[in-house]
Amino acid sequence: EVARMAYSGDYTQMEDIPFRIVPGTNPLHRESVFLERAIAGERVRLAMGLSLQPVQTRTLLTEGMDQAAIAEQYYEAPLVNIIPYACHACPTKQYRVTELCQGCLAASCQRVCPKGAVKFVNGKSRIDQKLCIKCGKCAKSCPYHAITYLERPCQAACGMDAIGVDEYGKAKIDYDLCVSCGQCLVNCPFGEIVDKSQI
């Protein structure tokens, strides 16, 4: 849709693309069809070389198209962008007990924890994230492999340690560290990270 519109040069149809990508009233992948269309709209803007729209103000998808349509223009930084409301706020660097916990009497996970972060609640182990120092001793000691390490895929893939967390728990790029390699983009399972194109 985006390529067809770009090659036709008729940018007036840009506002309709999110409705063509997400037709009807039922969402395809997220909790709301409106959220899906908003995300599709931001992806269209980035595909056209435009910047993300500020979340707190209402702007048209086509806003800024006049400047972006200039053939000799380079993209405006940043190249790699996070659509904030598309971010799923994946857990960041934490150990969690899964349903595989057998509540064994050995309680090796609890015994090896240097901070006393592992407790037993209703016969199953639980990790107090406020006390946990993420050493991984509990996970290594569990004979059932019931303790897993959760890390944001985008953050784990970033070799520059440029992915952080904003005040809402959403992923945020530190552009002073980011080299725009795209590893976060490739590894995000929710499609929240998008690079700019210059169609």
Each language-model region and where it sits:
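Ferredoxin-type iron-sulfur electron-transfer modules and their immediate structural context
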Residues: E1-A157, D161-G169, L177, L185-N187, ...
